Design a protein with these regions (language model features):
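Generic structural marker for isolated residues within well-ordered, non-membrane alpha-helices
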Residues: 9, 62, 79
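Conserved small/polar residues in nucleotide/adenosyl-binding loops
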Residues: 107-109
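Acidic, glycine/proline-rich low-complexity segments that act as flexible tails and inter-domain linkers
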Residues: 1-57, 84
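Alpha-helical scaffolds flanking conserved acidic
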Residues: 55-60, 89-94
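A short structural micro-motif
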Residues: 30-31, 67, 85, 98-105
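Mid-chain, well-packed structural core segment of small domains
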Residues: 72-93
Length: 109
């Protein structure tokens, strides 16, 4: 595996927790394993390891994106990740509320 893959797997474990990552990797099939490798290398190893934003900020952005995309299962895991990254409950709540005004309410206008 590449250096980005290894760094990504480490960051993914730090953010999401070992149990979450072990479950994701353990549930991977021959068909989905390349997707797990891609996510580790490019999302976690390529984007989450960049120096331009603190991890807590990246977590809040991820929560906003998952809210806008209506991905409740992924959102649940990343709320735990945001807490692991030092985000407060208030910051998470305000991020979700702010995003909901734009991403969810506008579909009813």
């Amino acid at each position: 595996m590449s250096e980005n893959h290894d760094r990504g797997l480490q960051v993914r474990r730090e953010v999401m927790g070992d149990a979450f990552v072990d479950r994701a990797l353990g549930n991977a099939s021959e068909f989905t394993q390349p997707l797990q490798d891609f996510v580790n290398e490019h999302a976690w190893g390529g984007v989450w390891t960049r120096s331009g934003l603190p991890r807590a900020t990246r977590s809040l952005i991820t929560l906003a994106a998952l809210t806008a995309l209506k991905c409740p299962q992924e959102l649940k895991g990343h709320v735990r990740g945001a807490l692991n990254n030092g985000c407060t409950v208030e910051e998470i709540r305000e991020t979700l509320l702010h995003c909901a005004v734009y991403a969810l309410s506008l579909i009813h206008i």
